[in-house]
Amino acid sequence: MRVLALSPGNLQQQLERLPALAAAAEQLEASLQVACDPSHRSLWTMLPAVKKVIPFPFEADPNLSDWANLLGLVREPDFQACLNFATGRQVNLMLSMSHIPMRVATEGFASTASATVEPGWTPQKLEAFLRPMGVSLNADDFRLSLPADAMEKARSAQPAGDGPLLLLAPGGLPGDWPDERWTSLPETIRSKLPQLRSVVLPADLPVAERAAAVACAD
């Protein structure tokens, strides 16, 4: 079985969808293809069931040509189901011509099954997208294995010593701390805790390497 996921949104939204798609793949014995912004490709390739990531500029006001290209990509494989996290007339028009028999969404004329999302923890409430396919979800049980090479790279990047490790992850986004605050924080803590070690994670660090750095900071 093949399942397509149309996944617009930021990195946080992609992370929230991981448990739901992993559950669908496991319980349906399905392979997955995910259409998302190209910047999120490295995240989805960490999920073993994802066989292909389709780059699509959901947030960049895609034109008719973009949608036509996406239609060509999703009509070629024999998808049995689509989890559509996108909204709007264009995506519904594209899906209505896709011949995918089951199309689950919160709204839209192209959906064949409706997902009624209740209030709650976002990863868990996305079970609403899975129920029409007979799939259950316990998002709290979801675990994602990290690549061994990313783990080893993270360990080797840690400063020598046995003191506590402080990870700093400047985002470089509006509202973030100014550079001098990030620079001064380790020194402020080190004045009270001389054995402190610190590592700054670059804002453009691939998500697998960022996750490995956190996992190794015990």
Kindly label every feature range from the protein language model.
Residues 1-218:
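Catalytic machinery of carbohydrate-active enzymes
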